[in-house]
Regions:
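Short beta-strands and strand-loop turn motifs
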Residues: 6, 59-62, 88-94, 121-125, ...
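Glycine/small-residue-rich loop that forms an oxyanion/phosphate-binding "nest" at active or ligand-binding sites
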Residues: 52-112
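Conserved N-terminal beta1-alpha1 strand-loop-helix module at the mouth
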Residues: 1-75, 145-152, 157
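Short beta-strand/loop segments at the ligand-binding rim of alpha/beta enzyme cores
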Residues: 34, 54-60, 119, 185-193
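Active-site-proximal loop/turn and secondary-structure-junction residues that shape catalytic pockets
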Residues: 11, 41-43, 62-64, 94, ...
């Protein structure tokens, strides 16, 4: 299994910035790892077109569990696939907290992604209070149990909430231990780390 490096642009970027980034990526050449970029929805189709044939995959940052319907402002996994995405992030801590997304909601999104032919990246992570209490494995285990579709075999992103944008960095041993726990707990084929470095 090759290493996967994924970049989540969050709510940042413009066509000009995307074009400059793609030019830099093409100039850099092969880096010996799999690359995935997840720009805002408004840039996915352009990114997919510019990166076609480069080996750099393009993903969405979220999707709705329904394929279509009266869900103002939402984007379905089918729509992401239609504009060239191959992956989609679901259950990011910012969405779990800011939009009160439950494990069950994350599971439905992951199932929708799989049904649309996308590779879901299911995010899990503990808060600082949960880590201090020593309950991080119980928290992550419960998130995996609730968020992963039955028989899941795909990508899980471990994103300790306390290490996202805070400048706090977990030790390599802590990250490796959590990755081993996740791999042993579910059918994940890859585990990504998402947090401060």
């Amino acid at each position: 299994m090759r290493i996967l490096i994924a970049g989540n642009w969050k709510m940042n970027g413009s066509r000009h910035q995307l074009d400059a980034w793609v030019d830099a990526m093409m100039a850099a050449g092969s880096v010996g790892v799999d690359l995935l970029v997840c720009p805002p929805f408004t840039l996915i189709e352009r990114a997919a077109r510019l990166l076609a044939g480069s080996g750099v995959a393009v993903g969405g940052q979220d999707c709705h569990a329904a394929a279509e319907g009266a869900f103002t402002g939402d984007v379905s996994a089918v729509m992401l696939r239609d504009v060239g995405a191959t992956h989609v992030i679901v259950g990011h801590s910012e969405r779990r907290a800011g939009y009160a997304e439950s494990d069950a909601a994350v599971r439905r999104k992951a199932e929708a992604a799989l049904a649309a032919g996308l590779a879901p990246i299911v995010c899990v992570g503990e808060t600082a209070d949960q880590r201090r209490a020593g309950t991080q494995k119980q928290v992550i285990g419960a998130q995996l149990d609730g968020s992963l579709p039955p028989g899941f075999s795909g990508i899980v992103a471990y994103e300790p909430v306390w290490a996202i944008g805070t400048g706090l960095v977990p030790s390599l041993a802590d990250v490796a231990a959590m990755h081993a726990f996740i791999l042993g707990r579910c059918g994940a084929t890859q585990v990504l780390y998402g947090g401060s470095v």
